[in-house]
Amino acid sequence: MKLGWIEVAALAAASVVSAKDDLAYSPPFYPSPWADGQGEWAEVYKRAVDIVSQMTLTEKVNLTTGTGWQLERCVGQTGSVPRLNIPSLCLQDSPLGIRFSDYNSAFPAGVNVAATWDKTLAYLRGQAMGEEFSDKGIDVQLGPAAGPLGAHPDGGRNWEGFSPDPALTGVLFAETIRGIQDAGVIATAKHYIMNEQEHFRQQPEAAGYGFNVSDSLSSNVDDKTMHELYLWPFADAVRAGVGAVMCSYNQINNSYGCENSETLNKLLKAELGFQGFVMSDWTAHHSGVGAALAGLDMSMPGDVTFDSGTSFWGANLTVGVLNGTIPQWRVDDMAVRIMAAYYKVGRDTKYTPPNFSSWTRDEYGFAHNHVSEGAYERVNEFVDVQRDHADLIRRIGAQSTVLLKNKGALPLSRKEKLVALLGEDAGSNSWGANGCDDRGCDNGTLAMAWGSGTANFPYLVTPEQAIQNEVLQGRGNVFAVTDSWALDKIAAAARQASVSLVFVNSDSGEGYLSVDGNEGDRNNITLWKNGDNVVKTAAENCNNTVVIIHSVGPVLIDEWYDHPNVTGILWAGLPGQESGNSIADVLYGRVNPGAKSPFTWGKTRESYGSPLVKDANNGNGAPQSDFTQGVFIDYRHFDKFNETPIYEFGYGLSYTTFELSDLHVQPLNASRYTPTSGMTEAAKNFGEIGDASEYVYPEGLERIHEFIYPWINSTDLKASSDDSNYGWEDSKYIPEGATDGSAQPLLPASGGAGGNPGLYEDLFRVSVKVKNTGNVAGDEVPQLYVSLGGPNEPKVVLRKFERIHLAPSQEAVWTTTLTRRDLANWDVSAQDWTVTPYPKTIYVGNSSRKLPLQASLPKAQ
């Protein structure tokens, strides 16, 4: 071996684990595919090659490695290349707005976007976020998320993504990406992949909770399930031209997500044709050589652990290229991928330096905050980037509110004599909307969950504020009891009320914070803060009780949903800063609810199957999460096991009624599917490397403490690496073929953005009439499901949908197409997609269990 960089022990341990017959194994795939500028990347790829060809080795390395935690203004920043006018890139959370900032908007969460089933709103939200990120001087938004997908209803970060259905998630994921990047900011598709729970996602985090485990959890999944479920939305992201992908903390089949050659090299880069760059989640980088050869392109935040001053890359990456352990083409490819994404969104024309600091709200501070070094300068310029986005946020909040039950209670008229507002979730956080770091508490109304996927509220309109305004405009009376434990007061208010509006919630978040004993993942899926008793007390004392649920996902409502005095139930999710106004718009009929549930409402937690792994189930080794449920999650699981939900996936009521009719199917003149064949071009080197003496620290450089630099300490590479394992034979740790830059065979399922172009060819055109049969304007979402026909397939899978607005008595024809991908299964033996000979049937309706229209499809290939 020529260079180990601390990863030798980890790699050795991994080889022992993977050699055990009873643990899942991730097969190697090498070499790491090099970008080729296919499709819409062609022009920016050429520009990237041109600029990278002019760079020195350390300039290339500077692009690949973060400068260290809290050492610049953003949560992650790369080095810069001043000689070529390439700035340090600013990377910043989150998927719903700018984290650690000010004068920014707090958008609805991804799960709310899923509930809208509205592609336009997904795009507009992405675009609005991109505008704010760009205006703050941020180059890369760390979002959106499709991992977790939602295998477990109690998974802590499900709300950051969209839905446990891959098709619904994939479409809205892609539209969000397009919106962000059209605003001139690189979007990051995360967390890739199988990051489905918080428990054990990071070994150090688990140790902090008292678990003695050697490594992070391994999500063990078969090839078919990976392709048909978890990889599906990431294919949509690649097809949408996403610039960055963030690899995850967990292991996949006992190989870490940021050094897993199967998921990074094979699936993402070779099969899906991803042309952008792969960054690590923060400290998810576990090796130097191993990660570089397995397909990682950018190390974030650059240091091995926060504020350690050490890095797997930086100077060590420079050493690795100089001594030949890592081929030049691999680091060149990293740099080209980063620069291609930079050019693709136009950052070269829109760049402004970050005008805020993540680490202080003070106007002035040190340039390098954590170590109090560098210039003492203006670090916060307090730039207001909100524009008119509050209107969009309010709109999404209202249009994502799912009406689950309505026995004539809604809409309200403002003529109600007395309105009772009941439950803590109606009111404000007594510590302020941003009173808990990263929203790590559940005080007052829940409009955002907790973790790094959050943003500071510029303000938060509570339900109490908004509804009181409504009542007073109607000259009514309003009583509010926001102590969820004061059941006697709640009962007294409910007895007097014309209508009782009960607000309840259920929270979750990221595993580094524990809230009320919930370590990221929910301990259960019941209501928090005595919610069930608040509802039952109100219903026992008021015959017109309407329940509004703010939650991160499904909750158990079996105790009271069918109570005769519960006349209405709405799910409002995590609606962001305009929460109260959004729910008031729906309650008072200014917005007719048209949202559909993006998940299933079961009667028990057990009805969902697939429990979280909350105990160390592999001794002191990496906990093992076996995804034996395969593709059967959420509604697919309920269908397979004949579980009757309370409210099914895709369900949602309206203040009007709709009728679907006249399903027509037209076969299209599609070509026969052809597996991709042939060879790639050989890898190319861009520029010359030169001698080690060119990459020693520049004379006179004033080093910043703990800052990660690309330069080496001396021309003695062994001494510069400071690695006791330096000098081992390559065969002991470098996988076969990992440094081979010759032409490589193309995979059958590859060939374009998102995979083989034949997958996206339209095979059938489908049309359905949709009519508003009621008296008010409203939105309907026709949903098209497919039965793939095989004995081990789900009963139905969602494939197409559209949100359509119709005036009273108006009729429209919804037309969509079915692609080969929509009808295909993954063939593990052929390593390609195939349309099986089993009969295919399509169903159209307005939920996964209300599908009145059906048609058989002719055989397709």
Curated annotation (Swiss-Prot):
UniProt KW keywords: Carbohydrate metabolism, Cellulose degradation, Glycoprotein, Glycosidase, Hydrolase, Polysaccharide degradation, Secreted, Signal
GO cellular component: extracellular region
Subcellular location(s) of the protein: Secreted
Class of the enzyme per the UniProt entry, highest EC level: hydrolase
Disulfide-linked positions: none
Catalytic site: D281
Domain of life where this protein originates: Eukaryota
Signal peptide stretch: 1-19
Chief localisation class: secreted
GO annotation terms (biological process): cellulose catabolic process
Similarity-based family: Belongs to the glycosyl hydrolase 3 family.
Function: Beta-glucosidases are one of a number of cellulolytic enzymes involved in the degradation of cellulosic biomass. Catalyzes the last step releasing glucose from the inhibitory cellobiose.
Protein name in UniProt: Probable beta-glucosidase A
Lineage, opening ranks: Eukaryota, Fungi, Dikarya, Ascomycota, Pezizomycotina
Name of the gene: bglA
